Curated annotation (Swiss-Prot):
Gene: oaz-1
SUPFAM superfamilies reported for this sequence: Acyl-CoA N-acyltransferases (Nat)
Protein name, as recorded: Ornithine decarboxylase antizyme
UniProt feature coiled coil, ranges: none
Family the entry assigns: Belongs to the ODC antizyme family.
Amino acid sequence: MSSILSSNFTNKSNQLVNESAVDSSLTASPCSTQPGDVGWCFDAPHGVLTKLPNETRAIVSAVSPNWRVTSIGEKTLAIMIPHDQPVLGISKKNFVDLLEFAEDKLEMERVLAVFEKARINPTEGFPRTLRYVGFRPYAIDEHPVHLPAEKYFIMSYKV
């Protein structure tokens, strides 16, 4: 799949990533209880999550500023999506750009959409929409240890 990114992202992706261009805050998002905040965090141990280029966060934020992203291992990109993510208002082009970036630039093998299980219905809303673009529910017995099936509903997309 060839990547068609906007010129802002294309210029940045041509630069080499060095240590200063890596966002260390992506190893874990702090939990927040402030009004308006999404109210969840990645609760994986620091050694499990991998640093990503700042460019990754910019591309994810172009889809939705409320999404959080990290890499689990070398070949899996995980995106935490708030339970109240509206279906409307998400740019289809930006979402496809994100999937292409994960494949072409980050060389990921899969993208995980992670939802708090207690706060969503897997057959409605945004999880339902993701099924139309090729995301499939992740088998409960395949959940990463730090994203337990009791707490998270995960959908997987093979890039």
